Amino acid sequence: TRRFDKFPLRVERLSGQNDVPVIVASEALLRVCPVEEGQSLRIVGQLRSFNNRSGQGNRLVITVFAQSIEPGDGSYFNRILLSGALCKKPVLRRTPLGRSICDVILAVNRHYGRADYLPCIAWGQTAVQIAGMDVGERLALEGRVQSRTYTKLLESGSEERTAFEVSIMQLLDEEETEETALL
């Protein structure tokens, strides 16, 4: 049986803020390229989702399934190409400063009849354009894997959690995507 390990990867944005996606890698891959804390890496993989039914932590768990890992050059690069279908009606809203923002869930098919359900967020004109789309319509995009912390209110108090989503940079023709995450 294949065994897997997971680890966080810090990717700095131009703003200086960090995104920290969770990487899932096979032990065989990690033997070829051992990972050490603080090391610069180049990872190519797929963004995956699964429902956590344990009642502990986030209900939707988003990870990057590493297909290749190699030493990085110290530069930060976070790019993902996705192609899928909208599986919920897009929700358009405005920020307190009046900027358009749209939340969508994209269903991305993978092998063996499985699909990943990935939360995505668009801004400005892209948000307005996506908000006019219908459930089931195809959407191809380029973006980045983004993480943000929030406080979840529970009966027993509150808990700090991290949400992962794809921040959409631009829409693409479907032929331009490979459903690959580059970190």
Language-model-derived ranges and their functions:
Residues 1-183:
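Single-stranded nucleic acid-binding surfaces, predominantly the OB-fold ssDNA-binding core
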